[in-house]
Amino acid sequence: GPEHNVIWKTSVPEGYSSPVLTQDRVFLTAFEDDRLLTIALDRSTGRELWRREAPRPRVERLDPRNNPAAPSPAVDDERVYVFFAEFGLLAYDFDGNKLWDAPLGPFDNLYGMGASPVVFDGKVLLVCDQRTDSFLIAINGTNGQVAWRVDRPEAASSHATPIVWQPNNGEPQLIVVGSFLLSGYAISTGQRLWWVRGMIHEMKSVPVISNGIAYVNGYGSPLNDPGN
């Protein structure tokens, strides 16, 4: 039951993101009183260590089933990275000091943005699929500068967080599932190395790779019937 084998319990504001654990911290994002929040908890006790508010220069259309704090944080050994569609990316150290921010958007996604950032090899990788002008961006985790950015013109609606894949031969890739296409991008340059057609319009779930096989699922219309 709820009172048995519970080490600690802490009340937090509402958010749809997942908590992320690293070292002695638990990081999460939340939305409360029109504020975009990043919160750090002590991993041993659940005590709140700090919370920081991101700027909110605009209010974007959002499906009532979504939340402005839907994307989950990402971490490396020194920093936590958060993405709010109504501002962009921000980086904090583990003590809550803001290191940089990278404004992005505005966005036009029917349900609101949902993909979380991914950190690999010093880069913060973020898929921003929307009705028009979709893109994939890599930002230097140390200074917030754009390492590369590539357009995704075929992507119209997706909320799936990408994954990193290391093939037996070749460089690490970012596997991105989006409207109608599954694609592999070189993390070093952003070049799209391969793609497979046949996906449906709404791709929502994180892909899984096992023994060299990618498993993906989605929801919506067939390839030639987008939006219906």
Please describe what each predicted stretch is.
Residues G1-N228:
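Noncatalytic, solvent-exposed loop/strand surfaces
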